[in-house]
Design a protein with these regions (language model features):
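FAD-binding core/adjacent interface of flavoenzyme oxidoreductases
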Residues: 1-8, 75-139, 220, 246-254, ...
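Beta1-alpha1 glycine-rich phosphate/pyrophosphate-binding loop at the start
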Residues: 5-62, 139-140, 149-172
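Residue-level detector of alpha-helix initiation sites
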Residues: 13-14, 109, 148-149, 266-267
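Internal hydrophobic alpha-helix adjacent to the cofactor/substrate pocket in enzyme cavities
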Residues: 24-28, 162-168, 276-293
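A Rossmann-like FAD-binding core segment of flavoenzymes
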Residues: 62, 68-91, 95-98, 161-245, ...
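FAD-site-proximal beta/loop scaffold in flavoenzymes
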Residues: 113, 119-135, 224-276, 282, ...
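Active-site glycine-rich loop that binds ribose-phosphate moieties when present
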Residues: 123-130, 142-153, 175-176
Length: 293
């Protein structure tokens, strides 16, 4: 027999947990389904979350789940969602019937193919500038990426350190005008191919170029390519932006009535944890009101 819920929340990051907490406090019967594979699992400390500055993302998730499960009406299950059928039958091993669905599954990062990058990711190599740049104020920093928005990201990083070199890996695009503007901030551009990153147990020490040069750097930001994890929702025909993010209105409603989204799978993509949590709370309010209609 298919178990019935008011709302099924898919994903237990800050967006999903915040949505679920606010919904269960609205006396909704809520099921949270999560694969327990957060993309920021390698990160030791997250920042900018008021009252939780410096907490690890995994600990933040643990505390959020603990708070949620203290409420009657909340159910948490470790499971991978394989399908959402019309009528909101959610399949994740078992099948669950919902009156509304909140998608908060985040995204997947694809990094430049550097053999040692993962060794330092989460310690001295990061992807979120606002989350981690403060710890490297005035330090020699690298920005590594293969996208067309490197100049914009470099300008942002230069607020924390102007000892910054942008490595395009012979792929990323920076125009002459952008390079001039970066130079005005003391930022240089290296267009050579990158072979790897170097370091030891103390952290990153340099960027290894394909021609053999090693450029000393003590920290780096990497610009990943992002993809949403939405194959399970394909049958719903949800509208997406040109970049692949779910289209939502100001309250988190998708193009399909009864389906909502919050967090990194929505435009403009990955943001700070506290922003995702706020989006989850906003969506919860919309879901609760819509279920009364």
């Amino acid at each position: 027999m298919t178990e019935q819920f008011d709302v099924v929340v898919i994903g237990a990051g800050p967006a999903g947990l915040s949505a679920a907490l606010n919904l269960v406090r609205a006396r909704r019967k809520v099921l949270v389904l999560d694969s327990n594979r957060p993309r920021n699992a390698a990160t030791f400390a997250s920042h900018g979350f008021v009252t939780r500055d410096g907490i690890s993302p995994l600990e933040l998730r643990r505390l959020g789940r603990e708070e949620l499960e203290a409420y009657e009406g909340a159910t948490f299950a470790k499971a991978v969602v394989s399908a959402i059928e019309p009528g909101f039958v959610v399949t994740a091993g078992a099948s669950y019937q919902a009156s509304a669905v909140v998608i908060a599954t985040g995204l997947t990062e694809k990094f430049p193919a550097l053999p040692s990058l993962r060794t330092f990711y989460g310690t001295s190599i990061h992807s979120c500038v606002e989350c981690d740049a403060y710890e490297y104020a005035d330090a020699p920093i690298a920005l590594i990426g293969e996208t067309d928005d490197l100049a914009e990201r470099a300008l942002l990083i230069s607020q924390w350190s102007r000892d910054l070199i942008v490595f395009t890996n012979a792929v990323g695009r920076i125009t002459a005008d952008e390079e001039t503007r970066l130079a005005e901030r003391g930022v240089s551009v290296d267009r050579r191919a990158v072979a790897d990153v170097a370091g030891d147990r103390d952290g990153l020490s340099g960027i290894v170029l394909a021609d053999g040069d090693v450029i000393p750097r003590s920290a780096a930001f990497v610009r990943p390519m992002y993809s949403t994890n939405l194959g399970y929702a394909a049958s719903l025909g949800l509208a997406t932006t040109a970049e692949g993010w779910l289209e939502i209105d100001d309250s988190g409603r998708t193009s399909v009535p009864g389906v909502y989204a919050a967090g990194d799978s929505t435009a403009p993509g990955p943001q700070q944890l506290i922003v995702a949590a706020g989006a989850g709370a906003r969506v919860a309010s919309a879901v609760n009101r819509d279920l009364l209609a």
